[in-house]
Amino acid sequence: MKNHLSNVLCAMRSDFKDNHQETINKMIQFGTVKYGIVKQLKDRARSADKDIGSDQEENGGCSPLTTATTTASPSRSPEPEEEQPEEQSTSEQSIPEQSTPDHQLENDIKSEAKSEIEPVEDNNNRVAMTKPSSEEREPNASGSMPSSPVAEASAEEAATERTPEKEKEKDVEVDVEKPDEAPSSAVPSTEVTLPGGAGAPVTLEAIQNMQMAIAQFAAKTIANGSNGADNEAAMKQLAFLQQTLFNLQQQQLFQIQLIQQLQSQLALNQAKQEEDTEEDADQEQDQEQETDTYEEEERIADMELRQKAEARMAEAKARQHLINAGVPLRESSGSPAESLKRRREHDHESQPNRRPSLDNTHKADTAQDALAKLKEMENTPLPFGSDLASSIITNHDDLPEPNSLDLLQKRAQEVLDSASQGILANSMADDFAFGEKSGEGKGRNEPFFKHRCRYCGKVFGSDSALQIHIRSHTGERPFKCNVCGSRFTTKGNLKVHFQRHAQKFPHVPMNATPIPEHMDKFHPPLLDQMSPTDSSPNHSPAPPPLGSAPASFPPAFPGLQNLYRPPMEILKSLGAAAPHQYFPQELPTDLRKPSPQLDEDEPQVKNEPVEEKDQREEHEQEMAECSEPEPEPLPLEVRIKEERVEEQEQVKQEDHRIEPRRTPSPSSEHRSPHHHRHSHMGYPPVVQPIQPAALMHPQSSPGSQSHLDHLPTPGQLPPREDFFAERFPLNFTTAKMLSPEHHSPVRSPAGGALPPGVPPPPHHHPHHMARSPFFNPIKHEMAALLPRPHSNDNSWENFIEVSNTCETMKLKELMKNKKISDPNQCVVCDRVLSCKSALQMHYRTHTGERPFKCRICGRAFTTKGNLKTHMAVHKIRPPMRNFHQCPVCHKKYSNALVLQQHIRLHTGEPTDLTPEQIQAAEIRDPPPSMMPGHFMNPFAAAAFHFGALPGGPGGPPGPNHGAHNGALGSESSQGDMDDNMDCGEDYDDDVSSEHLSNSNLEQEGDRSRSGDDFKSLLFEQKLRIDATGVVNTNPVRPRSSASSHGHSVGSTSAPTSPSVHASSQVIKRSSSPARSEASQGALDLTPRAAPTSSSSSRSPLPKEKPVSPPSLPRSPSGSSHASANILTSPLPPTVGIDCLPPGLQHHLQQQHQHLMQQQAAVAAAAAAQHHHHQQMAALHQHQEQLRREAAEAQQKAAAAAAAAAAAAAAQRQTPPQARDQRQEGGPGAGPPPNPLMGARPPFGMFPNLPLFPPATTQNMCNAMNQIAQSVMPAAPFNPLALSGVRGSTTCGICYKTFPCHSALEIHYRSHTKERPFKCSICDRGFTTKGNLKQHMLTHKIRDMEQETFRNRAVKYMSEWNEDRE
């Protein structure tokens, strides 16, 4: 097979010269000589003649070329000529690859080159070829190298110069020995200069001892001169040599594989052309070829190993010389320039047969100097601009010492250099691998290589994926967490990481902009800004002395003033022992890996991070050591459940100091001593308005502590007192006190009021601060805690309450002995559910339990998903850019069409929207009770003409009068809409209604609800109905003696004009936000301020002399009890209840029954009614004027008839006790005749709208309910007032967008509380038909199959009793 391949190559030699000369020249220029020739041979071999013998005879001169060798001996070879045969024989023994087909192919190429060059021989058989003079004038240019990198990369196995003299000499001498003079040679090589080429010499030889050749060249180059431009050029050339050596080794393997493929293809083609008689011989040749292929692969592997071993030996010898020698580098005598010049002249004049001894000595000295200088060059930075020399891989030094920064950085740089070194190698491999496609216009520009990594060769589908992958090589992490400072390679990883901070720091947005590492000092993480010192924020300060009070903590957010300004920061004027100025939950968890403390002399570098597990264990140990004796100034989490401490030990500790708690409670250091006292006792912290002295000793109910142990765990809420007392310090205080000396912080134990205008002394409120006039605590509280719209924040779970009581208590007895075939089968209806959780939720349809309760509005739900959907209505509403104000009552609306409907309520005209819908669209102001004494905004001052708040009308105003009596309302957000739209009318909220009703069974003084204190604060402002049937919004809690000057029980229904009412009323403060009956139990957040001289002047009508109410007694013993009796007036069971929509009637009836049980003094209620009727008499004149302007004749007649019937019904239904009380009040105490009764609009079921008198008859309520029901179907809800046009699918109230109009209509029912689908059995209402169908399933079990269920229950109970016996 070898002879066959040689004959084929020889036969094609003459054809190449004539037909392919131009192709060979181009291939040599582009460095693809061998590949181009092999490709041409591959094409030509398919049409080769079978007669090989005749071709050998015709081209007989070619056959000697296959065995003869031409040795190109440089003129300045350090070895003498007589030693060359020995060296060649040694090389022939060590490298068997020279007899391979690759070697034969190479010889043919050399013979072709010789015949094409046609040199002129001299007597010594040498051919002298001189380079152009232009190259000689530019020795430092990159083009002055003897061969370009591309040409060298495309040469055979060793396209490099043989001796160092070739780099410096411009005259190249080629020794061409005739075939008969050199019978055998193991290292064939030749240097040719093509006539049509660029004049660059091309070396074609096999790689042999390349490492030693490069070492000799380096030694010669460095020995010529250590400085100057020549040395720099030599360094560049040396870099090229080492870079090319690596590329050629890779290229050699690839070319050998191509030759093997060519041989196999030639064998296959030859086998097809042979006759059938020669098939056996062909098969033997094929087997021999396969054997030769395997042998070739083994030889290739041996050659690689041998080359690597030689390289390692050379490196080891160089290191050994450097270690053992220790001699400074030998400098030549004279300047470097003179030495270089003299050496060049000596090289030109010297003969090739110089003495061996001198050459050997020179070789040894220069090699040792070159190795020493190479070692020195590795450890010193290269000159600027020597980019080629800097790319040399110098990963050959000893192993680095442990923890050595210099060696670590050097090793990293070498890795990067090695990675960049592979770029050229991969590029050349691509050229060869896809060389066939280059002719078709494709090659490396095709999409497959467009996003290919040059480090590892992976291919990606997009440029962005490639850039992200490259970061794995470079170690770049551009995305930085702005909270803890951690870095990430992708934005997605940062987003996932940032969710860990979202719950602790919800107001900080994620910074998705890439930040380079050198810009870290301009972008410090948030935790570093929050740290009081440069050390880690995990460590607590030193513990204070045992008897000293806790010192005030320094501000923890020094650089965060502009990012987030907490509402409590502006309340530091009193300078008392203030708690931490930020909310406890605002401190995020420190997720950073703390860097170890470095010495000052040690360079500040980025060390490898410590293992997270070890660091966390050390941190836990430190915290365990520090937690017992030290207080925690910066707690990281919030706890509700508190440990109980023995009473004696607690009282003893409270007398001396505040004991820091072992549990990481965030507010343990910030609470007042009063809170510590009752919290140590195990009582739940309760927020409550200020109580008079007589009621500060409540009796604890047995179930008052039953819910704190079952609070939700997802987001732990702070304790109630700490949750509100720190945020609303002037409005709330504790109700659970142990002794009379721990009464309200703002009032003395004797009950005496502080002088008006004098702030309470600091010892009365140890942790209370002054309040800014523009501070809205509800808005700031809810805005800081509720999640923002379209966010993934889970802080809404702070406002849910989960009842962990057993949901299947009613079914446990039946399930004990029931034999159920399926584990997920319902024991009641035998329905099989998909899983255990679905079965548990299914049981709630039988038991009616709703364990998930909203703490803001009190609604309960069967599943957590429904509660989460409900929490969306409490989220913050986008800010209103403008609003439309009513000229009469100064209410504000975002939609002008809704304002138009609202004005029709004033004029008595029929409206397209119900008052509920109009009320829902109103823009609320913060409640006046949450504001300080004399501050009212302009709208609030005008709106206080309304008089809708029936709080006490009399008494001189004081700075602390109204500021301490407010209850918590809804935040200025979507919660306004939710609370103003029938929080109580909840058809699917049985559990919530029953719980509220049962909570009212407690005594009036006992206001400490167990787990529902937050909810009870809201719902104690629920609708109260007085004896006249008017919805009363007075809180049931009695107020203190300073604020209990008198009460108007039914003042919301009396006035018909805000102007006259404002002029006729005395200056007063509201005790709670008004609950309009249109909202049916929700807080009316519209401010009702007392008119001042400026605000009351807005009224176009003349003022009237205000009626001064009688002053009530001020003693703490009598007034408190009297005020409690006044506020708990009796409620007739049938009067006024039907005036409300039917959804709230059941709840109000139960509430009325509890109020009747709590009634203690009927005379006080009669006195309040007497005062109410006096106000009605004062407003009678303006009512007559309004009736003449607004009423029409037809409405007068219709309403007059209804008024007559209503008066008769009221006379019959009024309780005799209340009637006697009216008579006892005197002749002037009775209500005067109301001529405006006939001018009422057809919505009389909303009596607390301040414009109309109360509806006091059952017939009147029924008539108006019928009118409302007849109007509602004809006028569907259309907030945009677009007749016949389907408007946008965006909600006009909360600005949510829905996919269709029907979904929007269903959504509007959540605002309007409209439930059009009624159950025919229990009369419950539902918003959708699907909910009604689901509800009907419960009746199918409970009612329609009641007999079956009863029999089954009896059977189960009998079986259970038998088993029990």
Curated annotation (Swiss-Prot):
Biased composition (Low complexity): 63-76, 87-99, 146-157, 1040-1054, 1085-1100, 1114-1123, 1146-1168, 1192-1218
Source species, domain of life: Eukaryota
Zinc finger (C2H2-type): 451-473, 479-501, 824-846, 852-874, 884-906, 1289-1311, 1317-1339
SMART domains: ZnF_C2H2
Biased composition (Polar residues): 530-539, 1055-1079
Any one GO biological process: male gonad development
In-chain residues carrying the UniProt-annotated modification Phosphoserine: S739, S744, S1076, S1079
Keywords from the named record: Developmental protein, DNA-binding, Metal-binding, Nucleus, Phosphoprotein, Repeat, Transcription, Transcription regulation, Zinc, Zinc-finger
Pro residues composition-biased segments: 540-554
Entry keyword Phosphoprotein: yes
Basic and acidic residues composition-biased segments: 103-117, 159-181, 346-363, 603-622, 638-662, 1181-1191
One term of GO molecular function: DNA binding
Cellular compartment(s): Nucleus
Pfam families: zf-C2H2
Transmembrane segments: none
GO CC annotation, single: nucleus
Biased segments, Acidic residues type: 275-298, 976-991
Keyword DNA-binding attached: yes
Region (Disordered): 47-194, 270-298, 322-363, 508-554, 586-716, 740-772, 948-1012, 1030-1129, 1146-1241
Similarity comment: Belongs to the sal C2H2-type zinc-finger protein family.
Record function comment: Required for the establishment of the posterior-most head and the anterior-most tail segments of the embryo. Probably function as a transcriptional regulator. Could repress the transcription of the tsh gene.
Protein name per its UniProtKB record: Homeotic protein spalt-major
Organism: Drosophila melanogaster (Fruit fly)
Organismal lineage: Eukaryota, Metazoa, Ecdysozoa, Arthropoda, Hexapoda
